[in-house]
Amino acid sequence: MKVISLFILVGFIGESQIFSSASSPVNCQWDSYTPWSECNGCTKTQTRRRSVAVYGQYGGQPCVGNAFETQSCEPTRGCPTEEGCGERFRCFSGQCISKSLVCNGDSDCDEDSADEDRCEDSERRPSCDIDKPPPNIELTGNGYNELTGQFRNRVINTKSFGGQCRKVFSGDGKRFYRLSGNVLSYTFQVKINNDFNYEFYNSTWSYVKHTSTEHTSSSRKRSFFRSSSSSSRSYTTHTNEIHKGKSYQLLVVENTVEVTQFINNNPEFLQLAEPFWKELSHLPSLYDYSAYRRLIDQYGTHYLQSGSLGGEYRVLFYVDSEKLKQNGFTSVEEKKCKSSGWHFVVKFSSHGCKELENALKAASGTQNNVLRGNPFIRGGGAGFISSLSYLELDNPAGNKRRYSAWAKSVTDLPKVIKQKLTPLYELVKEVPCVSVKKLYLKRALEEYLDEFDPCHCRPCQNGGLATVEGTHCLCHCKPYTFGAACEQGVLVGNQAGGVDGGWSCWSSWSSCVQGKKTRSRECNNPPPSGGGRSCIGETTESTQCEDEELEHLRLLEPHCFPLSLVPTEFCPSPPALKDGFVQDEGTMFPVGKNVVYTCNEGYSLIGNPVARCGEDLQWLVGEMHCQKIACVLPVLMDGIQSHPQKPFYTVGEKVTVSCSGGMSLEGPSAFLCGSSLKWSPEMKNAHCVQKENPLTQAVPKCQRWEKLQNSRCVCKMPYECVPSLDVCARDERSKRILPLTVCKMHVLHCQGRNYTLTGRDSCTLPASAEKACGACPLWGKCDAESSKCVCREASECEEEGFSICVEVNGKEQTMSECEAGSLRCRGQSISVTSIRPCAAETQ
């Protein structure tokens, strides 16, 4: 570990004794509930909310109970998620995804896997040879509340690969992982910082001022509504409550361990988590702060634009200010210690630092040379946290050993650190009334930010700094003052005497005048006195009215506004666009509604993409067309298979073709997507023909699950199986249980797929049906009188099929498919335990 310097920034210039009266505790009080919201057509519920009328302070009680109430109701409007998806695929939840993601082997419908639910094996087009995502990647999709420092529910679907096959290699795991389509960059790079950062603060007031860099409401709002870096805010929450009875100074030691670095995609390319998308869909199109505030509670104020997975170590050590002063700690010792260095993992080397060590021991009231603090640890094993809460001043090796053990555990149990954030309203998309809801969520975030403004708090005495924590206010005291209201102790030097002014909360916005609205505030919380400084900032604030923006949105989305303003006449469905479709098409098109066209994958839209429903109930459509920007496979002749299979191919990509079913390829086998977006050579020159083997060529004998192709045995396709015994099996990749046959399981195993037999009752097998002669299975024979298939006796089996292991009457035995099918056909209960002969009989 490298040597680190400690900067002790405490000096005693002068003192002024303060005799302040104690402030009486103020208990939190709820305001009355707002009116009930409009009945939600999807959940058939309505909510109401109450805000805090009086914040608890000076040791008073916080508010008890929930801010929200919900009740059932009868909706007057339908559910927007019941609308269609146009040319795209509709998940069971109502969320729309590209049709190219259907039957690709990936569950792109986040919660229900509807895109893979009804796919036959022959329809599946696996888009990648691996499907294991990097460990803990789900953490990159969580929402984040910047005001509370807490991670919230998922807003990004980190499970979707988007049909892409992007891989990243982990040196620690010695394996490749498949990246989510929502991640732009994901790097496994362990960064352990050996240089511990630590600071010495002369009060909790100094600490909060340092960690909360934005103090005015306007600067807080500017920071809040732009992409910004953020670290955990929870450290400041507890600095004041722990030590109220004395004045304490803080020694803060911190460090980080990084395991992985990530960058999420731009918001327009992110696939939303289905629960979050549903909540966005359910938001009312008329502004109701209660409904939007509930979304903020569940999903936070921001989402993660980038960051690292790792661990964050921070410990706050409290030192009694008066005892430190009594031990004669002066700036002389500070300089001596600073010049020689001080480190908690090496022994003190200078006389000045030794004096500092003794002063810290005496001032912190430690015994056995142990300095105890309050740990704020993110990531790593929970069992290590208690061991990180103290430092042994005479045992630096022990300190290092405990820290290293925690740092090692971070690799397996990381959390998000060093996050860069983007406001949550940037993710409002792919829902009805998207522009209106995006505007309203931004407005709700502004109101939410105002709830945490310290203007709601009563003044702290002796220049203390108030902050809002939940439903109560805390006072962070200046050096050598303490108490619930900072009413006790002394102020040092030029801080004594005066009281600086503080802002009241902003008034409500005025009515719009010439497109602008204003609000005001006063410098009376508290007013400046005794030579104290006046408030910094403006007493009035003006901004553009939302009315103009809402009027513009009313033209784009008239159906999102009150019914009295919505036309009662509607246009038919928008005209079709070749190689394209309408985004978020919906089912109703009132006069004035605009729709936006987009193109299928592999095409780009040229022209004006917006069409408008005119007053004559006809669509006003400008010039537009979908221009090809990539190569698209033509309809291939029967028997030709292509690899890789993709919706489109960019210039320079190659495709190879082969023949199936014992056919051989005539013509070229490789094709290049050229700059003219045509295949070179032309694919029509490739076709499959029946290949006659030379008489002298030895014909290999293939297994039942194989077929002869180009003079060699290759795996059949499942649909090429002849009738075989029905079984239930679990796909170990997707964990889905499917009805298969013994033959199909052999074929899938031949192709490298991992399927495991399950009980017959675990899936729905095809019902037994009477079959005409000529379609009898192995265990059936033709009855001449009825011309129907009937059960064979086991002794009558002619073609036996596969040898399998079957449990009959509790005992396993090897028998042919025909014999097992004969028993099942006659109603006897059997269980297929292996698609191969029993192990005991093959040894």
From Swiss-Prot:
It holds the Pfam family Kazal_C7. SUPFAM superfamilies: Complement control module/SCR domain, TSP-1 type 1 repeat. Residues 124-456 form the MACPF domain. Keywords: Complement alternate pathway, Complement pathway, Cytolysis, Disulfide bond, EGF-like domain, Glycoprotein, Immunity, Innate immunity, Membrane, Membrane attack complex, Repeat, Secreted, Signal, Sushi, Target cell membrane, Target membrane. Membrane attack complex (MAC) assembly is inhibited by CD59, thereby protecting self-cells from damage during complement activation. MAC assembly is also inhibited by clusterin (CLU) chaperones that inhibit polymerization of C9. Its main location: secreted. Residues 457-487 form the EGF-like domain. Residues 545-615 are annotated as: CCP 1. It is found in: Secreted; Target cell membrane. Glycans are attached at W36, N202, W503, W506, W509, T696, N754. Residues 1-22 form the signal peptide. Residues 771-843 are annotated as: Factor I module (FIM) 2. Residues 83-121 form the LDL-receptor class A domain. SMART domains: CCP, FIMAC, LDLa, MACPF, TSP1. PROSITE patterns: EGF_1 (PS00022), EGF_2 (PS01186), LDLRA_1 (PS01209), LDLRA_2 (PS50068), MACPF_1 (PS00279), MACPF_2 (PS51412), SUSHI (PS50923), TSP1 (PS50092). Residues 121-132 have a biased composition (Basic and acidic residues). Residues 106-143, 518-537 are annotated as: Disordered. Component of the membrane attack complex (MAC), a multiprotein complex activated by the complement cascade, which inserts into a target cell membrane and forms a pore, leading to target cell membrane rupture and cell lysis. The MAC is initiated by proteolytic cleavage of C5 into complement C5b in response to the classical, alternative, lectin and GZMK complement pathways. The complement pathways consist in a cascade of proteins that leads to phagocytosis and breakdown of pathogens and signaling that strengthens the adaptive immune system. C7 serves as a membrane anchor. Monomer or dimer; as a C5b-7 complex it can also form multimeric rosettes. Component of the membrane attack complex (MAC), composed of complement C5b, C6, C7, C8A, C8B, C8G and multiple copies of the pore-forming subunit C9. This is Complement component C7.
